[in-house]
From Swiss-Prot:
Its main location: mitochondrion. This is Mitochondrial division protein 1. Residues 1-11 have a biased composition (Polar residues). It is found in: Mitochondrion outer membrane. Belongs to the WD repeat MDV1/CAF4 family. Residues 1-20, 131-167, 276-295 are annotated as: Disordered. WD repeats lie at residues 319-360, 361-398, 442-481, 501-546, 549-586, 588-625, 628-666. It comes from Sclerotinia sclerotiorum (strain ATCC 18683 / 1980 / Ss-1). GO terms for biological process: mitochondrial fission; peroxisome fission. Residues 166-253 form a coiled coil. Involved in mitochondrial fission. Acts as an adapter protein required to form mitochondrial fission complexes. Formation of these complexes is required to promote constriction and fission of the mitochondrial compartment at a late step in mitochondrial division. Keywords: Coiled coil, Membrane, Mitochondrion, Mitochondrion outer membrane, Repeat, WD repeat. Residues 137-147 have a biased composition (Basic residues).
Length: 667
């Protein structure tokens, strides 16, 4: 038998050598022959020398195999594939679990190192304890109440419980340690969340800066497109065509007249009628001047300043060489007009930070001015009021932009700040010579306050009068004597409410008799040096109401539909209710108020410091805006940086300082 086994093995090895590279059924056939040989050896004739154990075992197995159920299972098992065999051993859920939880080695190599000292399971435990802890606290309170009742009931018979057991103390210690561990894990989790939030905020801030730069570029491009002068060029071309047609007709008519009169005037080469019909040099120059470039009003409003942080500096302009006495602007990033003690009135392009030109005509410093669309009104110490139309300016921002684009990038990088300072100090000549409209002359002393709306202009002067002007006719239509009105009010009311009030302080030489005025239709508000605010009716020329409260000269005021806000040298700002005449609110600063203005949200005031005082009307918050707000607490205030005038519109604030510098801020 051993020989047959070795022979079979040798034959099987030979067959493997022949077809080793192929997978066939020969292996199974060889395995079957081995099983048959072994079975024949076990079931064959009984060898007296061998044991009967194998024979008995095979007999029992033969009886079991003859059962039908077992035969069917064996036959079905023979038909199954290895895949079916695996599926029969594992359930569907187990197969899915193994497929989902299997991780290849590539992913395992890329797992980052964990810096946390706690595991994922511990973090999961720490994120769930709130409800359980509340339930445990309630349960412990109930148990403690029950124990107290039992102790109280057993106080008479027993001497009390003994010392707590060691096991109980160990259990409480483990619970406390577990709670401390969970608290430490929660602290680490909260710290990780804070770091994650900080990273997200930093990413969002960087994205915001990128979008903000994009918005600034879009507004710059929008401004350039609006100054392309296509409409002006079209108008000029049409006017030139009309002039050429008119000139051609005049020449033809002159030639016909020359033919008729040629017999009597042979010595002349052209008739006099030609000189009458040809445009003169003066008219030609004036027509050319009227066709000069007109400043295009912006069709869209800038919104860049709305996205700056409150208190952010937008631009600084060295507007003058002396203290700023008045300033105003039309719209954010629009046109600003400023005046100073250097006796100049300058017009500025705030979008580019460049001077557009000078408004020349006053013989003294301008104390007050107002900008409304294209119209500018200026009141001077020479007792005159002049009106200007900025739409007739010859300023072209594209010329300066083209010059800058022609310069090299390296020069711009090296001398960028010097170029910006040069642009601010450079004053174009002759750009505003067509802007003057007319001059209003009636006051006999310096004009200290003015305000116009529509065709009505009100001016206040040191001659103690208010004058109403009709801007269509250019003449004074009414004169209001403040002292006479105060005396009339005193005589009518029989009290001292309307009389000229002494503030109880030494007279201030710098205080203007008429500090501020504002007109709306027939209503006029006027603040004077006696601290009174008088409300006039222009139809009757009488004082309708007097508001008493300030103890110093009123320097500024402004009203809307409901409230009137006034600022005074007594360091206070008062908000009045126009319906009742009572004080609605009031607050004070550490120095006199020299300028004030409000918009829909905030009240800004210049109070003798190097920063503008801002009062948020919506939430009642006071805060500072300006270079003083960015100054260290240990640094001293520079007197040259003290702010004298401030204006605000739609969160876009402009302030003028004693040094002549003008700062533009977002508030």
């Amino acid at each position: 038998m051993a020989g047959s086994s070795s022979r079979n093995a040798s034959s099987f090895g030979a067959e493997e050598d022949e077809d080793g590279a192929l997978i066939s059924t020969r292996g199974l056939e060889a395995f079957g022959r081995k099983v048959t040989t072994t079975a024949g050896h076990l079931i064959g004739p009984i060898d007296p020398t061998s044991s009967t154990h194998y024979q008995n075992a095979m007999s029992d197995l033969h009886k079991q195999l003859r059962r039908p159920n077992l035969q069917r299972s064996v036959f079905s098992f023979a038909k199954t594939t290895p895949t079916d065999l695996v599926r029969s051993k594992l359930s569907t859920s187990e197969i899915q679990y193994r497929a989902l939880t299997f991780l290849p080695d590539e992913l395992l190599r890329n797992i980052p190192e964990n810096e946390n000292s706690y595991s994922l399971f511990q973090g999961f435990q720490a994120s769930l304890p709130e409800a359980g802890e509340e339930k445990g606290k309630k349960h412990r309170r109930r148990i403690s109440r029950g124990r107290k009742l039992i102790d109280n009931a057993s106080e008479g018979g027993s001497e009390g419980d003994g010392p707590p057991s060691v096991a109980k103390l160990k259990k409480e210690k483990e619970a406390l340690n577990h709670r401390l561990e969970m608290m430490g894990i929660r602290k680490n989790m909260a710290s990780s969340e804070i770091h994650g939030i900080d990273n997200k905020i930093a990413n969002l801030n960087s994205m915001r800066r990128i979008v903000l730069d994009r918005l600034a570029g879009l507004e710059q491009e929008e401004s350039m497109l609006e100054h392309e002068n296509v409409e002006n060029r079209l108008e000029e071309a049409q006017e030139q065509i009309e002039d050429a047609e008119a000139l051609g007709k005049s020449i033809v008519g002159a030639e016909e007249g020359d033919d008729v009169e040629n017999s009597g005037m042979e010595s002349s080469f052209m008739s006099e009628s030609i000189y009458e019909k040809l445009p003169s040099s003066a008219s030609t120059s004036s027509s050319k001047g009227s066709r000069r470039h007109k400043t295009i009003r912006r069709k869209s409003m800038p919104i860049l300043h709305e996205h700056f942080e409150p208190g952010s500096s937008i631009r600084e302009i060295q507007a003058h060489d002396d203290m700023v006495t008045a300033l105003d602007f039309d719209v954010p990033f629009g046109t600003m007009v400023s005046s100073a003690l250097d006796d100049t009135v300058r017009v500025w392009d705030m979008n580019a930070g460049r001077c557009m030109g000078l408004l020349e005509g006053h013989t003294a410093s301008v104390r007050t001015l107002q900008v409304e669309d294209n119209i500018v009104a200026t009141g001077s110490m020479d007792a005159t009021i002049r009106l200007w139309d900025l739409s007739k300016a010859r300023y072209d921002p594209q010329d300066k932009i083209k010059e800058e684009q022609e310069e090299g990038e390296e020069d711009q990088l090296a001398f960028g700040e010097a170029l910006e300072r040069e642009q601010q100090t450079h004053i174009p000549q002759g750009t505003m010579q067509d802007c003057p409209l007319f001059t209003l002359e009636a006051h006999v002393d310096e004009v200290t306050a003015l305000h116009f709306r529509g065709d009505t202009l009100i001016s206040g002067s040191a001659d103690k009068t208010l004058r109403q002007w009709d801007l269509e006719k250019g003449r004074c239509v009414q004169t209001l004597d403040v002292m006479w009105a105060a005396a009339q009010a005193s005589a009518t009311m029989g009290s001292t409410e309307g009389t000229w009030r002494q503030t109880g302080r030494l007279p201030d030489a710098t205080a203007d008799f008429v500090g501020a005025v504002q007109v709306f239709d027939a209503a006029l508000a006027c603040g004077t040096a006696d601290g009174m605010v008088r409300l006039w009716d222009l139809r009757s020329g009488q004082v309708h109401r007097s508001l008493v409260g300030h103890t110093g000269p009123v320097t500024c005021l402004q009203f809307d539909d409901v409230h009137l806000v006034t600022g005074s040298l007594d360091r206070s700002i008062r908000i009045w209710d126009l319906r009742t005449g009572a004080i609605y609110d009031a607050y004070a600063y550490d120095a006199p108020i020299t300028s004030m203005m409000f918009d829909t949200r905030r009240i800004v005031a210049a109070a003798g410091e190097d920063m503008v005082k801002v009062y948020d009307k919506t939430d009642g918050r006071h805060w500072d805006c300006g270079i003083g707000a960015q100054r260290e607490a240990s640094e001293e205030m520079v007197e040259r940086n003290i702010i004298e005038k401030c204006r605000v519109k739609d969160g876009y604030m402009v302030e003028g300082r004693r040094s002549g510098m003008v700062g533009i801020w977002s508030c």
